[in-house]
Amino acid sequence: MSASYVFEPNPITSCKIIDSKENFPVRRILCVGANYVAHALEMGRDPSREPPFFFAKPTDAIINADRGANTIIPYPPQTNNFHYEMEMVVTIGKIAENLEPDETSDVIWGYGAGIDLTRRDLQKAAKDKGRPWELGKGFDKSAIISSLCPVAKIGHPKEARIWLSVNDVIKQDSNIDKLIWSVPEMISILSKTMTLLPGDVIYTGTPEGVGPIVKGDKVSGGVEGIGEVSITIS
């Protein structure tokens, strides 16, 4: 007997896949903070290799925004300091529990490029009071993502340029080989803390150069060999 609900369930959130008519269903969005040394420094954090910390965004914050798709993102409410953070994104395709770093490659489904949009003033206010970041990070349309590249097509990138521009001016320009905690290490740590399941999406951190955007700005970015995104703020 099929279940009945008091109202119609929300549609499944999904990511597009390069050269495929299939979509990747999103279960959960996890993000790692301060995972590039230079970005940790610009945010006033100790860049030493202390254990990474994670936060979450709601699943339906995902917005597919491949470059050239003319994706419009509204300037969010309750902020006067709206920031971009360009990131490589990792997606999980198998159950992951209590894995060591060298056991993680088989659970990765693919990779993408994403922007972690942030209400920086709300995030800072929460940090100053030792409170969670949800109001600064987990708002509507805050998880921009490109079409995904399957591991079967690109393998596991260890080195790739990661960049972002605002109105064609480069603001972030680094390489994923500068991650403090590697993708295998991040997945290992998460898998020892919670069960990762197919559909989990992990934003792996942003390099230095984060900054504000305003209405009318065109923001583009990418991870070389993986994907590119583009949005316009309205």
Predicted regions and their residues:
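Catalytic-core "active-site belt" of small-molecule-metabolizing enzymes
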Residues: 2-193, 197, 201, 209-234
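Switch II (G3) loop of P-loop NTPases
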Residues: 206
